[in-house]
Amino acid sequence: MTALQTILMESQGLLPMLESFDREALLAVNGSDSLFLDRVAHVLTTAITWIPLYISLFIVVLRNNDNFRKVMMILGAAAMCVLLAGTVDDLIVKPTVARWRPTHDPVIGAMVDVVDGYRGGRYGFFSAHAANTFSIAIFFCWLVRSRLLSTAMVIWSLTNCWTRLYLGVHFPGDILVGLTWGFLVGTFVYFLFYRLTRNMTSGRRLISSQYTSTGYQRKDCDIPVVILVFTLIFTLIKSCIL
């Protein structure tokens, strides 16, 4: 038996084991008997919930870039993150790999706790929610270089990932691959953006205690953080009342 044949045989045994672990891990975190958590997950997984956060990020970009062309390039870079992270996944990867979502999985589909009848599309590898949100988060981490904002953006992305697991529309493996792809996309897009805009200086005199290393006012970085916290609190209150 050749070394290649040995590797192939081992990989054939490893894949079912990983799939089994993925299913067990999903069932451990999917759903609950709490209508409150059901509402929280359902609200937080919806894109419209995060519109105020997107607007606040745009305000930060607008307030800290005097060059209109650079502002537009930042918006274009953010759009490229979504295009490469999510659209490529939805149009190419999911139909090619054709891995069932947990809610449609023939093996555990009947055991998945479905919230409000939400099952998602047939295929779930990999998670576009994880890839999209993490690519945007990583791009802004590189762009702004604020520890507070970076932490908030990562929490935002992981919150979205939690909702996908809770709702049972992705396996943990789908999420991990989505996060990995999102990180690579966000990093690639930022350095491409940096290469194209490194000669576009704002001309402002920066004071280190007031600005990040890339020239963003630290007080402006608080805006998305406050909006994120407010959104989470509002969602919790809304889920208690309704």
Tell where the protein language model's regions lie, with residue ranges.
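N-terminal transmembrane-helix/juxtamembrane module of multi-pass inner/ER membrane proteins
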Residues: 1-55, 88-118, 241
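Hydrophobic alpha-helical transmembrane segments
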Residues: 44-60, 76, 129-132, 152
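Hydrophobic core of alpha-helical transmembrane segments in multi-pass integral membrane proteins
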Residues: 53-61, 79-83, 223-238
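Membrane-embedded catalytic cores of phosphoryl/pyrophosphoryl-handling enzymes
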Residues: 113-242
